Amino acid sequence: MKQNVVQPANLEFNAEGTPVSRDFDDVYFSNDNGLEETRYVFLEGNHLNARFPLHPRSQFVVAESGFGTGLNFLTLWQAFDQFRADHPEATLQRLHFISFEKYPLIGHDLKLAHQHWPELAQWAEQLQAQWPLPLGGCHRLLLDEGRVTLDLWFGDINELTDQLDDSLNQKVDAWFLDGFAPAKNPDMWSEHLFAAMARLARPGATLATFTCAGFVRRGLQDAGFTMQKCKGFGRKREMLTGVMAQDNALPARAPWFARSGLENRETAIIGGGIASALLAFALLQRGWRVTLYCADKSPANGASGNRQGALYPLLSAHDPAISQFFPAAFTFARRLYDALPVTYAHDWCGVTQLGWDEKSQQKIDQMLSLGLPEQIAAAVDAQQILDNTGLPTDCGGIRYPEGGWLCPAELTAAVINLAQSRGLAVHYGYHLDSLNHQQGDWQLRFNNGADAQHSSVVLANGHRISDFSQTEKLPVYPVGGQVSHIPTTPQLEKLRQVLCYDGYLTPQNPENGHHCIGASYHRGQTEMHYSEADQQQNRQRLVDCFPKAEWAKEVDVSDSDARCGVRCATRDHLPMVGNVPDYESTLTEYQNLAENTETAVTAPVYPGLFMLGALGSRGLCTAPLLAEILASQMSEEPIPMDSTTLAGLSPNRLWVRKLLKGKAVK
C-alpha cells in the first residue's frame, strides 16, 4: 500500500542546459526564450496585467496543468510583486496558485533548472527552500509572508481533479493549460480534464495554452469555454485562449459533507491553545478581524501548556484518511514552524518510535508498508537506534528524521503575541457559558458577566468544545493525563532524539536540564490533579518496555515534578474541523439518507459556527494544517486537502457514515 508516493521526474539536461523529460522526450521550456514565452502565452494570454488592478476580490486564483520547473509560477509571482508595488491600495492583495504535477522534480534538479533565469532568483530561492517531498496529494506552501499561496498537487491531474472538494468549484480566475505537447503526452489532454477545468472556472475566468491543436480547442468548447486562436509566440504560428462565459449550476457530489464559508470577515475564537493561536494568525493574514476569548488568565494553560511536546506523524496503513492526512500535516507543520517569525524552544533532533515487543513491531511494519520517503519515515535497527539516539534499546523501530520536540507553551504564547501585533484582540479570563444565534449574529455570554456579539464563532477550546447546547452531541471525549518532569543523569543526557514506546521520553531541555516523560491516560477524566500513581506509572512503563536498559532505571520521579492536562479525542483518531453540525436537523433531514442520496440536502449546520478540535495527543502535528484548512474554508478560498480526507475530518462524519448505511445514530 503506497498510495502516498509519486514517481519523481526522470530528466536530463541537454547541451543548452535545458531540462528534458526522458519519459516524454520533450523539453520543460523553450531552448530559445522560455521566460518570454511564458509571459506571452500565459500572462498576456490571460490579460493578467490588465485584470489585476480591476480585480474585485482580495485574492486572485490561477490553476495550472503541469508545474514542471515552476517557470510559469515564478514569472507570475514576479509580475504580481510588481503589480503590488505599483498598486498598493488595490483590492487585490494575495495570489493563489494551484498546480498539478504527476512527476515532480527532485530539489537538486529544480535548483539546476532555475539557474537559467537569474532574474527570477529571489523568488526561485524561496520556492526551493520549501520544495516538498514526492508525496501524493496537496502540499501548501505559504510564500512572501502569506501573500502568495502555492498549492502543489502531486499526482495525475485527471485523477486529482476528481478528488477535489466541491468548495473549489468555480474558484479559478485563470487557467494555465500547460504540460508536455499533446502529441507527446496525450493522456493528460483529455475531455475529462477539460470538463474539470470548466467546473473549477469562475464565470468570466480565462484560459491560455501554447497549443492550437484542434481536438484541444473543440474539447474546451464542448466543456463550456468560448475559444479563439491567437498568434503564437516566436516561430509558433498559433495558440489558444478562452473565456468561461457560462455560469453553470453545479450539484454537490457529497452534500452531507458540504463546507461553507462567510462573506463577513469578522469572528471570535474561543480557546487559548496552539490551535486557536495558529487559526487567529491564519485568519489575520486573510484580512479578518479576530477576537480571542481565553477562559484562563494566560495562554496555553490547557493541553498546549507542556514544556516539551514531540512532533511526528501518526501513521496507519489501515485508514486511508489517516495515511493521507498526517504526512501532509506533518510536512506542513515543519514548513510553518520554520517560517514563523517567532522564537521558542525546540530541537528538530528526530523522533524514533520503538518496536519493543512483537505487537509494537507489527504496528511499525505496517507503518513502513506505506513506503513513505525516508526523509519522513525510515526503518532502523537496534544499532542504528543506538547511533542515532545515543542510548541502547535492544530493539528496532521507525525513525522520523524531520521530527523532534518543541515547547508548546512558548510557541502558543509567541504566536498569540505575533497575532496581537497584526491586530488580534485578546481577552483572558473569559469562560464562555453559552452562545445563541439571534438576528444573524452570535450572542456570547461569559461567566464573568460579560456579553459579546460576533458575526461568527470558532470553538477551539479543547475538551470544553462539547460544553454547549450546539455541540453536546459531538462524538468526542476527554482524556486526562500527567507528564512527568525528570532531572537528567549522566546516561540520560546522552539522549539525542525523542523516544516513543508505550509512552515517550524527550532529550533534556537545555533551558532547565529536565526531560519530559509521559503521559498517563485517563479516558473521560476532566479534573486532573497531581497523582503519585501516575508519576510512578510513567516511570514504570519505560522500565517495562526496556527491562535490560540500565539508563531506564535511572529515571527519577521523586521530585513530584509534573504537569496535568486534558486532551480531546475521537474514536477514529482523526480531528474535527469545519462547520458545527446541527445534530437534531441532521437526524431529521438524513433519516432516509441511505435511500435518497441523489436528493439529499446540504449538511445541516449552525450558520457561522465553526470548530477546530479533537486533536488528541497530536496537536503539534495537526494544528497548523487544520488552522489553514479552516481559515481557507471560512474565507471561501481553495482548501489544501482532497475531498475524501476532508470527509474524514468533518465533524458530522461518524453520524453520516451510519446514516449512509441505514443505521441508527442514537
Curated annotation (Swiss-Prot):
GO molecular function, one term: oxidoreductase activity, acting on the CH-NH group of donors
Reactions performed catalytically: 5-aminomethyl-2-thiouridine(34) in tRNA + S-adenosyl-L-methionine = 5-methylaminomethyl-2-thiouridine(34) in tRNA + S-adenosyl-L-homocysteine + H(+)
InterPro entries attached to this UniProt entry: FAD-dep_OxRdtase, FAD/NAD-bd_sf, MnmC-like_methylTransf, SAM-dependent_MTases_sf, tRNA_MAMT_biosynth_bifunc_MnmC, tRNA_MNMC2, tRNA_S-uridine_synth_MnmC_C
UniProt-annotated location(s): Cytoplasm
Similarity annotation: In the N-terminal section; belongs to the methyltransferase superfamily. tRNA (mnm(5)s(2)U34)-methyltransferase family. In the C-terminal section; belongs to the DAO family.
Database matches in HAMAP family: MnmC
Designated name of the protein: tRNA 5-methylaminomethyl-2-thiouridine biosynthesis bifunctional protein MnmC
Organism expressing this protein natively: Enterobacter sp. (strain 638)
